[in-house]
From Swiss-Prot:
SUPFAM superfamilies, A to Z: L-aspartase-like
Gene: PAL1
Species for this entry: Daucus carota (Wild carrot)
First and last residue of the signal peptide: none
Coiled-coil zones: none
Pathway given in the UniProt record: Phenylpropanoid metabolism; trans-cinnamate biosynthesis; trans-cinnamate from L-phenylalanine: step 1/1
Assembly: Homotetramer.
Protein name: Phenylalanine ammonia-lyase 1
Enzyme class: lyase
Catalytic activity: L-phenylalanine = (E)-cinnamate + NH4(+)
Pfam families cross-referenced by the UniProt entry: Lyase_aromatic
Amino acid sequence: MDCENKNVVLGNGLCMQKDPLNWGMAAEALTGSHLDEVKRMVAEFRKPMVQLGGETLTVSQVAAIAAGSVKVELAESARAGVKASSDWVMESMNKGTDSYGVTTGFGATSHRRTKQGGALQKELIRFLNAGIFGSGNDSSNILPHSATRAAMLVRINTLLQGYSGIRFEILEAITKFLNQNITPCLPLRGTITASGDLVPLSYIAGLLTGRPNSKAVGPTGENLTAAEAFKLAGVDGGFFELQPKEGLALVNGTAVGSGMASMVLFETNILAVLAEVMSAIFAEVMQGKPEFTDHLTHKLKHHPGQIEAAAIMEHILDGSSYVKAAEKQHEMDPLQKPKQDRYALRTSPQWLGPQIEVIRSSTKMIEREINSVNDNPLIDVSRNKAIHGGNFQGTPIGVSMDNTRLAIAAIGKLMFAQFSELVNDFYNNGLPSNLSGGRNPSLDYGFKGAEIAMASYCSELQFLGNPVTNHVQSAEQHNQDVNSLGLISSRKTAEAVEILKLMSTTFLVGLCQAVDLRHLEENLKSTVKNTVSQVAKKVLTMGVNGELHPSRFCELDLLRVVDREYIFAYIDDPCSATYPLMQKLRQVLVEHALKNGETEKNLSTSIFQKIAAFEDELKALLPKEVESARAVVESGNPAIPNRIKECRSYPLYKFIREELGTVYLTGEKVTSPGEEFDKVFTAMSKGEIIDPLLACLESWNGAPLPIA
């Protein structure tokens, strides 16, 4: 026999759906690159309108509504289905059918019965208004208004599917509140997200029904009564008198937890891409070896998150001016640094990849949740029955948020390890300790305070990585004996996102400081080389009588010393006898003198006799030349341009330095690190970092470089 549409024929002749368990749908949702998905999310976030139909809502659309600048439109095609379920409830009530939450009590007391359906809904809202707000201007116990907007949107989307027994007019009223930026005040705490987010959602119902304790906030932050909110939103006809089942329809859902989870995941996905790009910039400024991104390594590991993370880093590093310079340095002196970079650099794709897979999977889980019907009972008009189940159990939220938070903690841990290497002159391949940018390291401690702050952020973030969902308490007379704690987990993940933004901000400013230090290093090294060469030619080439002197052969080895020595190890006092430059330049001259043989005994051909003159001339000239080179770099007209301009990571650097106006930090300036961090953190929180971040990857074709 043949099967129609999406069915398949089994061996026994029966027909079944191709994907009856939705595993195929879940797998298909993860096709394509994570970066492409982030780009899609950003594009959706920026659209001016969200049309709700019940089944196509996305995380980015929820985040956009939460941000407050987007309008909502209800699909007119949903009206008939919503009305049908509402009518069914009323007809069922009139026939005397016994239905949970319509004629019965609630939860563990559902053995009670009543025929006063409207009064029952009113009592439901009253007893669920159990939240605590505090008094005065204290907002610490109020759910953020952005999260409330997200919850309102998700709840409308669920109710639009026509299984909930609620009037379309109520959904239109909530939509008007959203579009006029009028937000009910919901308590921050008090829900276990099973049976849904009962307590917070009851305050949306309280506003709709005009409860005297209901409060709202207007477009400019003004406090509104229910009557003022209705008038300002243009909701006509007065407060709603809830019909049977309508109160339950409003409160019996997971919208608060999944709404906040959507907001969290929108930011988390972007921060994950930022972590990939910053890891590549870290490799650039640390003079890392790019082979850690080689596709064969990651192909043999098979994990898609790792393969993509490596490919993104490979793209940033491919053709990087820093990588080219580092390769020359490694060839010149292969023993100057370890054969392999440390784990925070070399294994960053292996570390970030699984976190990205978790974040992506969680995003899809939440997208399924915000398009789910979470009521109990469900009204199945087609079969003329109410189905009692447990879709209000928000386990997908609790689990996905716990997993996401652990992934965020892992990203933060990597960031801290990378930052710790960056500021430590034992590990950072020639950058100054603390990334100090001034002339006198004894009066410039650079990012030392920032490193302490990063340790604090990382510790708190690791604590937040602990799960919420293993702290379930049996509730409501042991009826709700297992519950998801979805909103609690979402809230903790929102905290984790804020901390990761603090860490990302600090690290990003540190990377820009390192870029500028590499630029200064290159200019100063060129100046030192030119000066040493100039002095060598002047002092070492000729003897006292104008004859060629044996010391003329020392110049090449002297310049090799300059090439090999880390500039910031001596540049604050370049001619100090206790610093490595003068010591090693003298060592070169001594070694040449020892090889000079018998001619060394002759004062006119002695290289030893030239050492004092060479050092005196260098001391007279080098400090002035170094200061002049610094001044030229600071004036913005350096002899050697900043390599970052030749790199794919430049858009991010340009944004931080030019558009946000952050400065190169030194102890010579009044500006503190925290002032610059604030500029970046504010921009990051506004989403302004997205475009320069994506610009770094604009030319990536979505695949690793071919294995040559």
